[in-house]
Design a protein with these regions (language model features):
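Short beta-strand-alpha-helix junction that forms the catalytic/metal-binding core
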Residues: 60-78
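Short, non-ligating residues that shape and space the ligands of small metal-coordination modules
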Residues: 46-47, 78-81
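Histidine-centered catalytic micro-motifs used for acid/base chemistry in nuclease
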Residues: 50-56
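Cys/His-enriched microdomains
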Residues: 35, 49, 70
């Protein structure tokens, strides 16, 4: 999918690099230790949680703590590049 965005590949690479560094941090390890998916509230073993950007990098999101949450693989794969409002609409369509 293509977005009308001014986000360059270089910016995305930079943000992914920052995200890799955050994955090594005590902050991220504590978030994973909680074992909860931000989106579905499922309990998930820490090693199976993924890092998700609430506002995706391709949509202009940044790799900052306020934009990063733990997500189960199922939710992360379904959410992909959706913004929070779009994700909510997706969930409503399921019901």
């Amino acid at each position: 999918m293509v977005f009308a965005s001014n986000v360059t590949e270089e910016e995305i690479k930079k943000e992914r690099s920052i995200a890799r560094e955050l994955r090594q941090s005590t902050w991220w390890k504590r978030k994973c230790a909680d074992g909860t998916c931000y989106y579905c509230n499922s309990r998930v073993p820490a090693k199976l949680l993924t890092m998700d950007h609430i506002v995706p990098l391709v949509r202009g999101g940044k790799s900052v703590k306020s934009n990063i949450v733990t997500a189960c693989k199922a939710c992360n794969n379904k959410k992909k590049y959706l913004l929070p409002m779009e994700w909510e609409e997706y969930l409503l369509d399921l019901t």
